[in-house]
């Protein structure tokens, strides 16, 4: 039996890791971007980001003051689990108090803060059923400088691949420097209005620099990435070659009359941490 306490402790560890330690794939992408940059301000900004990442790990403190809204992805296998949501919520509360992590969650109308990063329907928990002998939990802290620039379109099927490219590029360029570029762009194609955005967010969990195994999707990722970086928006919107580190796409089948497109923009701090709990 995977108890509530086991889940709580694992979520505490993952949330703490996610806000403090940036993945090696993102760090390498930033280092590679620095080598390619010719713009002085762009170099300065990427150097500052890399130094910030280093200091966060050394001091054990969050890499950004916006520690985001905790988004949780669960893969639930053939295991016995007790009080999953309660365990997740208690782990988030514990990390908020002890790391500490800035409390960001408020009532949308009164703006009163819960002070524990948990609230009505928060954290959002996506559950995927799998045929394995473990419970896997991923924490994605999503900052709202980037989240506020997400976009969704119920495109017509006739708009096709060119319409997808145009909407994604247009959405990122419209955001300019607001999402703290260099960004990572998650794109969801297909499904429904809500599913395409969920897929876009899930796409952010993919390795930066690693292409989609579907050749057609991989080509689309590369084409969108090239177009965005040709804009010259650059790091923090101050000019340069690197507006976006990578574009990640997930697709779903959809209704014959629709082509939903969801664009989820993530700042340079593409933070997430994953852990597994086995039944034994």
Regions found by a protein language model. Give the residues of each.
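Non-transmembrane, aqueous-exposed alpha-helical and coiled segments at domain scale
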Residues: 1-187, 192-280
């Amino acid at each position: 039996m995977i108890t509530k306490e086991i889940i709580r402790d694992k979520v505490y560890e993952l949330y703490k890791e996610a806000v403090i330690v940036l993945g090696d794939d993102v760090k390498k992408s930033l280092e590679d971007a620095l080598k390619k940059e010719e713009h002085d301000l762009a170099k300065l900004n990427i150097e500052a980001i890399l130094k910030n990442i280093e200091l966060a790990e050394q001091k054990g403190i969050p890499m950004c003051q916006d520690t985001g809204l905790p988004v949780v992805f669960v893969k639930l296998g053939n295991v016995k689990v007790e009080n999953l949501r309660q365990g997740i919520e208690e782990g988030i509360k514990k990390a908020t108090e002890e790391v500490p992590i800035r409390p960001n969650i408020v009532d949308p109308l009164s703006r009163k803060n819960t002070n524990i990063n948990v609230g009505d329907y928060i954290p959002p928990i996506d559950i995927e059923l799998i045929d394995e002998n473990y419970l896997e939990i991923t924490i994605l802290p999503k900052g709202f400088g980037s989240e506020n620039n997400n976009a969704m379109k119920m495109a017509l099927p006739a708009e096709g691949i060119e319409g997808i490219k145009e909407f994604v590029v247009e959405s990122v360029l419209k955001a300019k420097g607001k999402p703290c570029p260099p960004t990572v762009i998650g794109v969801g194609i297909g499904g429904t209005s809500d599913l395409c955005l969920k897929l876009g967010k899930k796409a952010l969990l993919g390795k930066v620099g690693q292409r989609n195994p579907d050749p057609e999707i991989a080509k689309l990722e590369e084409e969108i990435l090239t177009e965005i970086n040709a804009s010259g928006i650059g790091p923090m919107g101050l000019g340069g070659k690197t507006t976006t580190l990578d574009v990640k796409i997930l697709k779903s089948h959809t209704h014959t009359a629709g082509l939903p497109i969801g664009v989820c923009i993530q700042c340079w701090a593409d933070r997430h941490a994953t852990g597994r709990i086995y039944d034994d």
